[in-house]
């Protein structure tokens, strides 16, 4: 019983010394306790450590009291005998020594604790309120900066209601704290609480225009963010009757002036509910100037305007329809004429090109027979005869070269004689002439290969073979591709005609309109490339 009384008296004296700030008396008390410990248990620190953990009726330890009262000398003396677990002991107010020092703005004690145990800045109370939050809401900028320097991530700690320190600092208009938090991590601006509110939602509830500007400068994309009730920052600023903040929000071109919340209300609807005052008039005027509307008019046109438009449409419907039909008929007729003209020009250009190519082929074939390699006999009974006349390659060359010459001459005669006024007749002539030119081209190719075998000689026949292997696939591939395009064009023409008939029968044009467009459709339904 006497031992309990002694401990009680010791504790009372100990707490009295701490509260009075009498360091010498406290040291004497601790020294006496340490001396007794040495005699009884030979453990000088256990009794003092136990004394550091003792709590008074309010649940406060000696370290807690010195931190709360900003007794730095007492605190530095006691902290030598304390551990992290001792500092983390909470009082009945649900705060530990570090928490209460941060909340009350005791910078020296906060820095000392951060130096010893940096992890203290992440220890929260029962409501998950961090020491940073407690210091921020009290506008203790130096303490906030000290904790952010040690651990910048502690700014992202949220309370049980989902709010960060920026939410509350923005609500109370603590500009210095807002700047410090955003400077460390701008991502904190987009954090939403359990009501879906960002820091901007909270800031517009206050009266600090600078805080709202600071948040929007950090991230203007949250301008149209909605909370769980569908309210944007403009809704809340209007409902709270904040004319300056409302005007600031409306200066952003990205703002949704007519955003509708879950109650189907716009900012204009909320402005109408405000009590009559100068602020309400300023807000209403700013919203009207920005083009704000009531929720009942969003998504549908004004009835009077719609009725006026309907009457005007009915009045001019017949005249405008007739004029439009006449313009359309003239336009379609003009397009059809231009298209037919383009067809004729294309066919004529092809005809001219074929004539030039045919003349070129004939010239080459004619000159080739008189410019043979090896030249001719100049003496004897065979004067004028080619030196290579006896070779098979020369004979093949003469045959194919003559064939190419005669075909080219025939094409030239046809081109300069026949005149086809109709486009379809021109296409038929060009189609036949094209096939003749294919034959002339093939003969010229064969003549070249034949004379190549004669020129290189038997010892270098590999050169002629190489030329043949190189040229034959190119020419054969080209002619095969052209044949493919020709046959595809022929086979598709019948299908296209049937499709045009079905399409024409399904259209509900008037007789006069279809009469004008039928020819145009027939002429305009064509491939980008036509093979003749």
UniProtKB/Swiss-Prot annotation:
Origin: domain of life: Eukaryota
Keywords for the protein's UniProt record, in alphabetical order: ANK repeat, Membrane, Repeat, Transmembrane, Transmembrane helix
Compartments in which it is found: Membrane
Keyword Hydrolase in annotation: no
Pfam families: Ank (PF00023), Ank_2 (PF12796), PGG (PF13962)
Transmembrane segments: 354-374, 396-416, 436-456, 467-487
Membrane topology of this protein: Multi-pass membrane protein
Main location (coarse class): membrane
Descriptive protein name: Ankyrin repeat-containing protein At2g01680
Source organism per UniProt: Arabidopsis thaliana (Mouse-ear cress)
